Amino acid sequence: MHELALTAELLRLLENNAREKGIKHIKRVKLVIGALSSVLPEAVEFSFNTLKEGPLFEDAKLEIEEKPVRIRCRDCMAEKAVDHFYPLCPSCGSGRVSIIEGKEFYIDFYEGE
């Protein structure tokens, strides 16, 4: 479960950034997780709620935006959201597709005081 290690690092980054900015309490954290990132949102949420400690994260809420897989065909230039990555364009059947969304894993923002 690599989500535990990822979440521990995420909390460390948030703590360091909050300290630099003089923030004493983080209220809300928004993450973006892509469907192809190999990161399970439920495991990150569990890890966040398990690992957050101290006054900085006391009331912190985690919001996760899940990004679907989007591909672009390099032949017909179609852009499509797909349920699962399949290396063929759903419009023309070409195998020349690029993933343009779905690999993300980042902190979008956090709110604190």
From Swiss-Prot:
GO terms for molecular function: nickel cation binding; zinc ion binding. The keyword Nuclease does not apply. GO terms for biological process: protein maturation; protein modification process. Ni(2+) binds at H2. It comes from the Bacteria. Keywords: Metal-binding, Nickel, Zinc. Zn(2+) binds at C73, C76, C89, C92. HAMAP family: HypA_HybF (MF_00213). PANTHER family: HYDROGENASE MATURATION FACTOR HYPA. Belongs to the HypA/HybF family. Involved in the maturation of [NiFe] hydrogenases. Required for nickel insertion into the metal center of the hydrogenase. This is Hydrogenase maturation factor HypA. The lineage of its organism: Bacteria, Bacillati, Bacillota, Clostridia, Moorellales. The gene is hypA.
